[in-house]
Amino acid sequence: MTITQMISEILMHNTVYNYILSLISIILFIVIGKYANALIERLADKLHKKSGIELDELLIRALSLPVAIAIILSGFYFGVNFLYLLPSLKTAVNEGILTAFILCVVVFFDRFLNELVERYLALTISKKTKKDVDDQIVVLTKKLVRLVVWVVGLLLILSNLGYDIKTLLAGLGIGGLAVALASQNLVSNLIAGLIILTDKPFKIGNWITFSGGSGIVEDIGIRSTKIRATDNSIIVVPNSKLIDEIIQNVPSKNKWKVSTTIGVTYNTPVEKIRKAEEIIKNILLEHPNVEDEPITVYFKEFGDWSLNIQVVYYIKNSRYNGYQKYISTINEVNLKIKEEFDRKGIEFAFPTYTLYLKRDD
């Protein structure tokens, strides 16, 4: 075998000129795709500023990425066709490129419909009902739309790969009973999720207590509900089980109650007890995470080894990182009380006992 023949075998019977044309085609279309993406984004911005028509803007923005990828895929398609490939390899490459084109279309509909739901569903219903749409309804609708789009996309891809969709659907019909039995839990969880959304025993951001624990509801999904527990862990509860629970719900828990007792020594004079109450109240009033009202600080009782000052206050809650905010606020308040008491010479009490020893002479 001559050197020329060896090189020809290595290059799969393509000339260097063929490879250069293929590479130029791919690079050229990558550059065009990049600029097309930027151009479409600028067009969307300009359209929004001029007309303020959000639907057109959504459509164009949703097109930007899929169009850019489609242009780049076109470059690969033309690049491959500049080369001589084995028929089976060429067919496989072309099928792969066509599959990627279908994915671009799926991504477009996924982006466009989800943005449409995000922007217009809440606005449309709120105009009719004069109230905001619950966040979880929008989230659930987006998930369902995404599921439908990707299922249709998967069927198109399978059809492109040579599978008979009618046969597949018929097979699903024959095995429908088995699928129904296997998906019984999924269906029951889906129905339970819809019951939670419509009946509204709780909403995202509510604090609930049930047999499995307690915490803030972070997400109500198709299959399960996610609850942020007090130790910052996530409890995932199937919806079908949750609706059978006895749930204690504080729907307006926008604050956390803190009740604590601070003991000072028995030799603390009355003036310093009053000063201690004043210090604690000022610290709570000045902290940004503490509700201004109600704050309760009072001399509660004469304890076994301390004069007890009762402190009750409320920490503002937030939908996200609520528990972290709760513990960090308590930490900051307690450190500040310790610092101020030390500075004013107010002593904390600790368990002490006085022993009287009687000596028999």
Swiss-Prot record:
GO terms for cellular component: plasma membrane. Keywords: Cell membrane, Ion channel, Ion transport, Membrane, Transmembrane, Transmembrane helix, Transport. It is found in: Cell membrane. The chain crosses the membrane at residues 20-40, 65-85, 89-109, 137-157, 177-197. Disulfide bonds: none annotated. Pfam families: MS_channel_1st, MS_channel_2nd, MS_channel_3rd. One of its GO terms (biological process) is monoatomic ion transmembrane transport. InterPro entries: LSM_dom_sf, MS_channel_1st, MS_channel_C, MscS_beta-dom_sf, MscS_channel_2nd, MscS_channel_C_sf, MscS_channel_CS, MscS_channel_TM-2. It is a multi-pass membrane protein. It comes from the Archaea. Large-conductance mechanosensitive channel that opens in response to stretch forces in the membrane lipid bilayer. Selective for cations. Rectifies with voltage. Belongs to the MscS (TC 1.A.23) family. PANTHER family: MECHANOSENSITIVE ION CHANNEL PROTEIN 1, MITOCHONDRIAL-RELATED, YNAI-RELATED MECHANOSENSITIVE ION CHANNEL. This is Large-conductance mechanosensitive channel MscMJLR.
